[in-house]
């Protein structure tokens, strides 16, 4: 295709990013070039923007980042048959090898050689982005581009919540009400949970959790989550605890509040080792602890589509800000302060 485009680039090994003009990516015979309509800011992007310890170890500058997006196919490689120019799409952002043991046994989401869009390859905070054709997901023509751009993080929430087979009529606790935690509240409601506790220190996000279906919100700064959960459940504990915060104290509390025989699903990424009481909080309780990474390909995407198209999940309350790409610094400031749900950048 050729030409130039605007993109947000992590240009230096320091805080912040730069809006630059760079070449439009060229594609190979199995790739697709997409004109980005909407790109949402993820917690991973904030790590990169802040240049924290994780980013310093993981990111090689210069790097175009961003990975949650929707757009229109602008060009296809000569071997691509599953999509065509003009198709309205989003994409699975974990690029897998297809040849390792996990891939060959259907566990693509834990591929040994995963590469991530906007982390290992040029990302979607740009006017154009390229992805492998096999990663492209076609969107309904009437889906709002902002909503279409957040299907990937909704997939994280869906994977976290729906791994439990015992949620209908049961109880769920969502610890950490960032955007994916908020989505998990909505998914738990759609899955039939009768009691949903949302736990955070941010009153703004707890209010959003209430709108999305939380039956009780717990401000961890103002009350003891374990005491509230004990009262709420009559001492029985929570059937499914979803840990989205990554804070060591919250992780330990989450294990304690889980019911005997319950489940503890962890999507969060603690920045340091966590000390927990495995004997009493896991072994003697018969607790199932499961790490969650990415989305099952493409089972989770089908679940996401069903939840959105059926109206069982409405992400309108989660999408709180839409800004032009040029105002990315304002978007990152909102994310860093926690005074937002999902922030969408429009190229």
UniProtKB/Swiss-Prot annotation:
According to its UniProt record, the EC number is 1.1.1.103
Q: Does the keyword Oxidoreductase apply?
A: yes
For this record, an example GO cellular component is: cytoplasm
* Biological or metabolic pathway of the protein: Amino-acid degradation; L-threonine degradation via oxydo-reductase pathway; glycine from L-threonine: step 1/2
The protein's UniProt keywords, in alphabetical order, are: Cytoplasm, Metal-binding, NAD, Oxidoreductase, Zinc
The processes (GO biological process) annotated in the record are: L-threonine catabolic process to glycine
Q: What class of enzyme is it?
A: oxidoreductase
Q: Which residues bind Zn(2+) 2?
A: 97, 100, 103, 111
Q: Record's family? A: Belongs to the zinc-containing alcohol dehydrogenase family.
Q: What this chain does, per the record?
A: Catalyzes the NAD(+)-dependent oxidation of L-threonine to 2-amino-3-ketobutyrate.
Q: How does it assemble?
A: Homotetramer.
Identify this protein by name. L-threonine 3-dehydrogenase
- Recorded name of the encoding gene: tdh
């Amino acid at each position: 295709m050729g030409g130039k485009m605007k993109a947000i680039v992590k240009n230096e090994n320091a805080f912040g990013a730069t809006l630059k003009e760079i070449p439009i990516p060229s594609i190979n015979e199995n790739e697709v070039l997409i004109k980005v309509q909407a790109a949402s800011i993820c917690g991973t992007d904030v790590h990169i923007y802040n240049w924290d310890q994780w980013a310093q170890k993981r990111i090689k500058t210069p790097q175009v980042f961003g990975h949650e997006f929707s757009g229109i196919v602008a060009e296809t490689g000569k071997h691509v048959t599953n999509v065509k120019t003009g198709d309205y799409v989003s994409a699975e952002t974990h690029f897998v090898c297809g040849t390792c043991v996990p891939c060959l046994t259907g566990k693509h989401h834990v591929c040994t050689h995963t590469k991530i869009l906007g982390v290992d390859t040029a990302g979607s905070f740009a006017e154009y982005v390229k992805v492998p054709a096999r990663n492209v997901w076609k969107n309904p023509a009437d889906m709002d581009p902002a909503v279409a751009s957040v299907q990937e993080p909704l997939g994280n929430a869906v994977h976290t919540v729906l791994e439990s087979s015992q949620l209908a009529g049961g109880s769920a606790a969502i610890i950490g009400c960032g955007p994916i935690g908020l989505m998990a509240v909505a998914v738990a409601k759609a899955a039939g949970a009768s009691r949903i506790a949302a736990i955070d220190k941010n009153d703004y996000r707890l209010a959003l959790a209430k709108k999305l279906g939380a039956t009780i919100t717990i401000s961890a700064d103002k009350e003891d989550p374990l005491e509230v959960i004990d009262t709420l459940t009559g001492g029985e504990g929570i059937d499914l605890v979803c840990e989205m915060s990554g804070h060591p104290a919250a992780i330990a509390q989450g294990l304690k509040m889980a019911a005997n025989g319950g489940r503890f699903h962890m999507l969060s990424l603690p920045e340091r080792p966590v000390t927990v009481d495995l004997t009493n909080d896991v072994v003697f309780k018969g607790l199932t602890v499961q790490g969650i990474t990415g989305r099952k390909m493409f089972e989770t995407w089908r679940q996401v589509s069903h939840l959105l198209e059926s109206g069982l999940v409405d992400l309108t309350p989660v999408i709180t800000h839409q800004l032009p790409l040029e105002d990315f610094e304002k978007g990152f400031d909102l994310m860093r302060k926690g005074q937002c749900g999902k922030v969408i950048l429009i190229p």
